[in-house]
Design a protein with these regions (language model features):
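N-terminal amphipathic/basic-hydrophobic helices that include classical n-h-c signal peptides
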Residues: 1-8
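Active-site catalytic microenvironments in core metabolic enzymes, especially phosphate/sugar-handling
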Residues: 9-239
Length: 239
């Protein structure tokens, strides 16, 4: 999914400084650099946004004559091969050839209280009183519905059937969630006594851990739970 927005002309470094400050990016210890990852033309007007900087999204940005691409998943992850070969070479070559700036924001775009993936997901799922749990990336809020109703709401929002673990008629009042691949954060939901935890992915051991702790678990898709932050940030930048 892509989103294209028009803006008043702005310098690429000025835009980076603004987004860094708006997302409080310097306060996050992350798995990748946040900010301008690939430098393109100095002046930016047309921004295309999406979840991940794959070839399809880059090609879309080229087709739409974008000056910048704004994503949640960019390049240069910790532990990845550092050489520019294969698909990584192809992606970066396409950006450089077309003078497109690549901005990527990972954890800062999950956590932001307005445009962040978690807040944006809460708004779409009609979760009441959404708030972060301490200094974790997990959020909590209230719903008043059965597990099957919560799962249906997730499916309506993401347009895909989630994996649901738990009794479908169980009542859900306190819900915890974290977008993306946050199944290991289930412990934070258990600690606050949540009735259900929603994230993007599920690992082999998670259903048993959830069942033994009497908490429902919904895996709604990594990409599906993170479609909203970059789009909301791009929309904010129109102001």
């Amino acid at each position: 999914l892509t989103n294209s927005t028009q803006h008043k002309m702005i310098n690429n470094k000025t835009l980076e400084q603004y987004i860094n400050q708006y997302l409080n990016a310097a306060n996050f210890s992350d798995y990748c650099p946040n900010g301008l990852q690939v430098e393109g033309k100095a002046e930016i007007c047309n921004i295309v946004s999406g979840v991940s900087a794959n070839q399809a999204l880059i090609d879309q940005a080229i087709d739409e004559k974008a000056d910048a691409l704004l994503v949640h998943h960019g390049f240069f992850w910790k532990g990845e091969d550092q050489v520019l070969t294969g698909i990584k070479k192809n992606r970066i070559k396409a950006l450089l050839k077309n003078d497109i700036n690549l901005y990527a924001y990972h954890l800062p775009l999950d956590a932001h209280p307005v445009v962040g993936n978690n807040m944006q997901l809460a708004m779409r799922l009609n979760i009441q009183n959404p708030t972060p749990i301490g200094d974790t990336l997990v959020w909590r809020g209230e719903v008043n519905a059965s597990l099957s109703e919560v799962a249906q709401s997730v499916m309506n929002v993401t347009a895909r059937a989630p994996q649901v673990f738990g009794k479908k008629h169980a009542q859900v009042q306190t819900v915890a969630w974290c977008s993306g691949g946050a199944q290991s954060y289930l412990k934070h939901a258990i600690d606050i006594g949540a009735d259900c935890f929603i994230t993007g992915e599920v690992s082999e051991q998670i259903p048993a851990i959830a069942k033994e702790n009497n908490i429902a678990f919904i895996a709604a898709g990594h990409h599906a739970t993170e479609r909203y932050g970059a789009k909301a940030l791009a929309k904010h930048l129109e102001c």
